[in-house]
C-alpha cells in the first residue's frame, strides 16, 4: 500500500536565519528579541564598509547604506556613532552583558549613552569595529537596523506598560508587532524625514504621545456586544522648529485585526509621496503636512 500523500517535504534549512543559506526569518518569542536579525545584512555591511575604506566606494554612496544600519559618521576621520534600538525600552540581562562586552572591546571611551528615545549609542567607534559590534549584538537579538536615516526610528513606550494598574490592557505586544511590520518595509526606507513613534499604556500618557509623529493610546469599545481593543491615533506632533501637539486623527482604530497597522501604513504612504517636503529638510516632517492639509 502506498504511503505517498502527494506532498513534498521541504528540505531543512542550514545556517542562521537571514543568512544566504537560510533566507527565512522566523520570529523568536524571546524577551528583548523584537526586530528580526538578518545575517546577510552584517555580511553586506562588511562588504560595503570594506569598499569604502579601500576607496572603492564614494562617501555619498556609502552614507545611505550606513545610516540604515544605525551607523552615523562623526566629524573625526574613521569614527562612527552606533545607535542600537531598544524597542519600547526593553532589554534583557543577556543583552546588558553584551553591551558591556562590546563597549569594553570596541568603544574607545569605554562607555555608552542611554538616549531619551530608548536607544543605546556608542561613540568614536572605528568603522571596521562598528561592523563587528553590530554583528555581535545581533547574536543576542539586538538590532541597529533603521536606528538612523529617514525611516521609522526606535519605537518608544511607557516603561510601566504591562504592570501598571491604570492600563486597559497591555499595549506591548501591539507595539512589538508595529516594530516588526515597519522595519525594512519598502515604504519606510527613504521618506522625506524620520518617523518617531510612541505607544503609551494609559491616559496618564507616560510615553508623551503629543510630541510624536505618530502615537497610540489604548482604548476599548463595545462592538456588537464584544469588548474590542483599539487605540486612539495621534499624528503630527513634534518639538524643535514649529512645536506641535499631535492632534487625534482617529478616535478608535482596532488592534487585533491589524487595522492600526494598515492605517499607519496609509499615513506613511501619504507622507512619502509629498516630494515638496523633501526640498527643505528642516520642515520635512509629518507635522508640516498635517498643518497644511489638516487632521
What is each residue range found by the language model?
Residues 2-295:
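Peripheral terminal and linker regions in Fe-S/redox and tRNA-modifying enzymes
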Amino acid at each position: 500500500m502506498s504511503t505517498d500523500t502527494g506532498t513534498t517535504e521541504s528540505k531543512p534549512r542550514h545556517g542562521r536565519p537571514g543568512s544566504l543559506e537560510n533566507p527565512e526569518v522566523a520570529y523568536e518569542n524571546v524577551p528583548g528579541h523584537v526586530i528580526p536579525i538578518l545575517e546577510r545584512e552584517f555580511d553586506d555591511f562588511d562588504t560595503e564598509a570594506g569598499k569604502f575604506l579601500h576607496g572603492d566606494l564614494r562617501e555619498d554612496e556609502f552614507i545611505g547604506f550606513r545610516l540604515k544600519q544605525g551607523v552615523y559618521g562623526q566629524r573625526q576621520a574613521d569614527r562612527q556613532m552606533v545607535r542600537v534600538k531598544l524597542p519600547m525600552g526593553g532589554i534583557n540581562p543577556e543583552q546588558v552583558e553584551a553591551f558591556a562586552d562590546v563597549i569594553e572591546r570596541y568603544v574607545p571611551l569605554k562607555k555608552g549613552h542611554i538616549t531619551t528615545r530608548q536607544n543605546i549609542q556608542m561613540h568614536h567607534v572605528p568603522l571596521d569595529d562598528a561592523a563587528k559590534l553590530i554583528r555581535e549584538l545581533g547574536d543576542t537579538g539586538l538590532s541597529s537596523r533603521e536606528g538612523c536615516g529617514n525611516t521609522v526610528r526606535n519605537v518608544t513606550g511607557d516603561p510601566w506598560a504591562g504592570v501598571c494598574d491604570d492600563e486597559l490592557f497591555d499595549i506591548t505586544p501591539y507595539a512589538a508587532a508595529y516594530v516588526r511590520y515597519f522595519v525594512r518595509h519598502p515604504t519606510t526606507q527613504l521618506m522625506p524625514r524620520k518617523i518617531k513613534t510612541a505607544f503609551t499604556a494609559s491616559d496618564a500618557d507616560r510615553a508623551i504621545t503629543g510630541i510624536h509623529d505618530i502615537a497610540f493610546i489604548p482604548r476599548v469599545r463595545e462592538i456588537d456586544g464584544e469588548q474590542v481593543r483599539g487605540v486612539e491615533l495621534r499624528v503630527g506632533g513634534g518639538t524643535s522648529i514649529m512645536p506641535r501637539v499631535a492632534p487625534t486623527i482617529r478616535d478608535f482604530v482596532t488592534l487585533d485585526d491589524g487595522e492600526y497597522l494598515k492605517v499607519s501604513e496609509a499615513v506613511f504612504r501619504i507622507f512619502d509621496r509629498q516630494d515638496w517636503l523633501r526640498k527643505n529638510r528642516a520642515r520635512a516632517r509629518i507635522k508640516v503636512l498635517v498643518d497644511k492639509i489638516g487632521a
